[in-house]
């Protein structure tokens, strides 16, 4: 991976945040996004493809009104990033437990009708995935090397378990979405830093 690639942030920022750190498991779905496999069996994600998919996802999400976008994270380290993403972009976030029926039961007080959903991890956010499928809304998901993507419409390959990795990816997705929406100029500084999206450190 060359330092001179035209990336959204310098390559070292991706690496420092651990965006490239996959798992020791891989699925056939995620093989195209794996850069190499280390001697210890850890699969390394190609951050150029992460970068490319963040741009594609931002472009895709910009076709919707922000109040039609739902972002979800059952994962602890994804809860602050999805909350900050929603704050920055005007979307809706569900950090923590996703109550069954949120998308499928109009009788439920917390019932929502988004037009598109963003998942932090298709496995951890399985309830949201199943409900989004059942009501027929597109699914964007952050996918690690061990995820299956058959039910995902747009996968963003990334470490979807790490605190700093999730913060950086959601920060970039928010920034690029605002640019696509014309709410942030191309050369304008984003009012948030990636650190603002970071969840609390381990206790």
UniProtKB/Swiss-Prot annotation:
Alphabetical UniProt keywords: Ribonucleoprotein, Ribosomal protein
MF-aspect GO terms: structural constituent of ribosome
GO CC term (a single one): small ribosomal subunit
Keyword Nucleotidyltransferase part of the UniProt annotation: no
Pfam families found in the cross-reference section: Ribosomal_S2 (PF00318)
Biological processes annotated in GO: translation
Domain of life of the organism encoding this protein: Archaea
Sequence intervals crossing the membrane: none
Gene3D superfamilies assigned: Glucose-6-phosphate isomerase like protein, domain 1 (3.40.50.10490)
Record-linked HAMAP family: Ribosomal_uS2_A, Ribosomal_uS2_B
NCBIfam families the record matches: uS2_euk_arch (TIGR01012)
Entry similarity comment: Belongs to the universal ribosomal protein uS2 family.
Protein name per its UniProtKB record: Small ribosomal subunit protein uS2
Species lineage: Archaea, Methanobacteriati, Methanobacteriota, Methanomada group, Methanopyri
